[in-house]
């Protein structure tokens, strides 16, 4: 695939001013015309987009809602790049979907991104949704944010209906991924990509002061406890993030949290983003939609 060589080159110069923002801007132009409703939402430090596929009722605090946290290694992508995925998710889940355009590294830290995601959740709560009506969902780095947000909410006694993670990056530590057999078969991520991400995440955290100290890096898989939302994970059988998916499922199950991993052979990382071209992506999103509907009654 063409993506892997680009990431390989970028991994040698992670701090160079690569135009990562262009990806989401270009995707906005490429979104096909449809009857899907997309409304801009303002959050305290970020923006969001409320997406409602044709036939889905407005977000009014009834039925269900999905809080979607996009992937992109914490440094790129947004509501536009994930437009088709989110549109189909809204359709199959029969639900409005709030996509948070959280702040990105390297200018901002992962902690700041998580704050923005929390603000998105609060926005849905203020709209009238109860925790048991809200599903947290995300792909790749968005899977990390979804799980970290679920843990933050657990600390204040709120448990969303479910958590859905697509090809999730759930562990910032790179060593186990780089040693995984799939590092040789992953069509997107060379081993050095995780070195580059590690450097960018660490430098962004060092610049963000929390109570007078640099932001600490948070590992969600080190904080798995009973009471987290039931979880569904979809992952490619050949991608290196299969490691994170299987480790998360094992830890969740050990804590008594219902967790299911569905492995898709022959697919690439985050193949659901290509839903306009891949029948398998549509099948995956249909299954996820059914899971969300069942979890929210």
Swiss-Prot record:
It holds the Pfam family Abhydrolase_3. Coiled coil: none annotated. Induction: Up-regulated in nutritive stress but not in acidic and oxidative stress. GO terms for molecular function: acetylesterase activity; triacylglycerol lipase activity. GO terms for cellular component: extracellular region. Keywords: Hydrolase, Secreted. Its EC number is 3.1.1.-. The keyword Cell inner membrane does not apply. InterPro entries: AB_hydrolase_3 (IPR013094), AB_hydrolase_fold (IPR029058), GDXG_lipolytic_enzyme (IPR050300), Lipase_GDXG_put_SER_AS (IPR033140). The keyword Flavoprotein does not apply. It catalyses: a fatty acid ester + H2O = an aliphatic alcohol + a fatty acid + H(+); a butanoate ester + H2O = an aliphatic alcohol + butanoate + H(+); an acetyl ester + H2O = an aliphatic alcohol + acetate + H(+); decanoate ester + H2O = decanoate + an aliphatic alcohol + H(+). Its main location: secreted. Inhibited by the ionic detergent SDS and by the serine protease inhibitor PMSF. Inhibited by the FDA approved drugs Diosmin, Acarbose and Ouabain. These drugs remain bound in the active site pocket and could be probable drug candidates to combat TB disease. Optimum temperature is 40 degrees Celsius (with pNP-butyrate as substrate). Optimum pH is 8.0 (with pNP-butyrate as substrate). Belongs to the 'GDXG' lipolytic enzyme family. Was identified as a drug target. PANTHER family: AB HYDROLASE SUPERFAMILY PROTEIN C4A8.06C, ACETYL-HYDROLASE LIPR-RELATED. This is Esterase LipU.
């Amino acid at each position: 695939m063409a993506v892997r060589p680009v990431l390989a080159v970028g991994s040698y110069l992670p701090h160079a001013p690569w135009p990562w923002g262009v990806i989401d801007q270009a995707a906005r132009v490429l979104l096909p015309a449809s009857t899907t409703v997309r409304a801009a939402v303002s959050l305290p430090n970020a923006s969001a987009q409320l997406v409602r596929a044709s036939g889905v009722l407005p977000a009014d605090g009834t039925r269900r809602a999905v809080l979607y946290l996009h992937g992109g290694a914490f440094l790129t992508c947004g509501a536009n790049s994930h437009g088709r995925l989110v549109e189909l998710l809204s359709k199959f889940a029969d639900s409005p979907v709030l996509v948070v355009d959280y702040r990105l590294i390297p200018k901002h830290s992962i902690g700041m991104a998580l704050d923005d995601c929390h603000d998105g959740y609060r926005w849905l709560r203020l709209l009238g949704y109860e925790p048991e009506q809200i599903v947290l969902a995300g792909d790749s780095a968005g899977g990390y944010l979804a799980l970290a947000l679920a843990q933050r909410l657990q600390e204040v006694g709120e448990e969303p209906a479910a958590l859905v993670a697509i090809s999730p990056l759930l562990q910032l530590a790179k060593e186990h991924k780089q040693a995984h057999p799939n590092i040789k078969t992953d069509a997107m991520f060379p081993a050095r990509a995780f070195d580059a991400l590690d450097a960018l995440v660490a430098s962004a955290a060092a610049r963000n002061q929390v109570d007078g100290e640099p932001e600490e890096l948070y590992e969600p898989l080190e904080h798995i406890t009973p009471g987290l939302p039931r979880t569904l994970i979809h992952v490619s059988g050949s991608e290196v993030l299969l490691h994170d998916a299987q480790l998360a499922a094992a830890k969740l199950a050990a804590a008594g949290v219902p967790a299911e991993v569905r492995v898709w052979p022959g697919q690439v990382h985050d193949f659901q983003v290509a839903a306009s071209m891949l029948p398998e992506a549509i099948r995956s999103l249909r299954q996820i939609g059914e899971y969300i509907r069942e979890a929210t009654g």
